[in-house]
A protein has these predicted regions:
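Beta-strand-turn-beta hairpins that frame and shape the catalytic cleft
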Residues: 1-4, 88-102, 121, 125, ...
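Active-site-proximal loop/helix segment associated with metal-binding centers of metalloenzymes
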Residues: 101-176, 181-192
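N-terminal active-site segment of His-dependent metallophosphoesterases
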Residues: 1-52, 59-67, 135
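Active-site neighborhood of phospho(di)ester-bond hydrolases with catalytic His/Asp-centered motifs
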Residues: 5-7, 27-32, 51-56, 81-86, ...
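Short amphipathic alpha-helices and their capping/turn segments at secondary-structure boundaries
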Residues: 44, 82, 88-97, 155-171
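Conserved beta-sheet core of the metallophosphoesterase superfamily
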Residues: 41-45, 49-53, 96-99, 183-219
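Short coil/turn segments at beta-strand junctions that form active-site/ligand-binding loops
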Residues: 1, 25, 48, 96-97, ...
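Active-site environment of divalent metal-dependent phosphoester hydrolases
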Residues: 10-15, 34-38, 57-68, 87-92, ...
Length: 219
């Protein structure tokens, strides 16, 4: 299967026109496509199936739970497969069954270990102010982000432990994971190095990688 990846387009400000990649079988949108959501309509009549995992900026200025429900409704209307702690199985052109496992996988600030977590969470305060997200009337602060991140990680771990169900629609041959946040320090932008703020962009999910054919992420 040939996968086209688009992420972090920020079409709310950037002048960019997405185009289908020749020969692609599937488009993955790995988050931060448009904080206003309006540009999602560009992918409604895409020539291939479209899988979308929301980024943190899809929740800017919104209640995260209400925003997710709204995104689901909009993507359902547009024919886009939104994955947030969900899986989707499709058949590749060669007949193999591909399981896509998707979650935003918010940052848990453990990229540099638990001892460095407080520093990483302090560094995250800037990004939280930019995002302006809420949950149940409270600021979606680093503690709330970490709590949601751990829910995502637990779901991801349990999902990756599952085995294919032979002779059923739930059968698959290989697994592809899609997250918005990077799954490893190896995913970090080398320009910024190992600084506390990097833990707001990547997680230490290297232990979840065995058995995963491909891990796609944004940021």
């Amino acid at each position: 299967m040939r996968i086209q990846l688009l992420s972090d387009l920020h079409l709310e400000t950037e002048d960019y026109t997405p185009r289908a990649a020749p020969g692609a079988d599937l488009l993955v949108l790995a988050g931060d496509i448009d904080t206003t959501w309006s540009s999602l309509s560009l992918f409604a009549n895409w020539p291939t199936p479209v899988v979308f995992v929301p980024g943190n900026h899809e929740f800017d200025g919104r209640d995260v739970d209400e925003a997710l429900a709204g995104l689901r409704d909009q993507c359902r209307h547009l024919g886009i497969h939104l994955l947030e702690k969900e899986t989707w199985i499709t058949t590749a052109p060669d007949g193999r069954r591909i399981r896509f496992v998707g979650t935003t996988r918010w940052c848990d600030f453990d990229l540099f270990g638990s001892e460095q977590r407080p520093r990483s969470m302090r560094a995250a305060n800037y990004f939280v102010k930019v995002m302006r997200a809420m949950r149940n009337g409270q600021i979606f602060d680093p503690d709330a982000v970490r709590a949601e991140a751990l829910v995502c990680k637990d779901w991801l771990r349990e999902t990756l432990r599952q085995t294919p169900q032979t002779d059923s629609d739930a059968n698959w041959d290989t697994t592809v994971v899609i997250t918005h946040y990077g799954p490893s320090l190896r995913s970090a932008d080398p320009r910024y190095g190992k600084q506390p703020g990097t833990a707001s962009f990547c997680n230490a999910d290297d232990d979840l990688m065995p058995g995963v054919a491909c891990w796609i992420h944004g940021h």
